[in-house]
């Protein structure tokens, strides 16, 4: 599985989280969740698509690939572990 930047990790985690709750994701949803501009989201989504983690449709629909699900779960686990570590310091 390809290594992605910590910034892209935040994006795949957000996309996956929205997808599992609503079964549909739009760029504006990701922008609101991460409090970033739509332009930043578009750039990140294009990169995630290049890595094969999402499918980014012409009409703004986003779906998570199998690889994307694996990566998102890996990122969530990593973030939970870090959070637990810092809570116990």
Please tell me what each predicted stretch does.
Residues 80-89:
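Amphipathic alpha-helical dimerization/coiled-coil segments
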Residues 60-78:
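Basic, amphipathic "hinge/linker" alpha-helix immediately C-terminal to the N-terminal HTH DNA-binding motif
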């Amino acid at each position: 599985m390809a290594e992605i930047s910590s910034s892209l990790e935040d994006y795949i985690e957000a996309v996956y989280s929205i997808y599992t709750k609503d079964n549909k994701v739009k760029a504006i949803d990701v922008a609101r969740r991460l409090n970033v501009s739509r332009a930043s989201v578009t750039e990140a989504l294009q990169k995630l698509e290049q890595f094969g983690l999402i499918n980014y449709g012409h009409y703004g629909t986003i779906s998570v690939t199998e690889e994307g699900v694996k990566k998102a779960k890996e990122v969530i686990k990593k973030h939970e572990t870090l959070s637990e570590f810092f809570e116990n310091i």
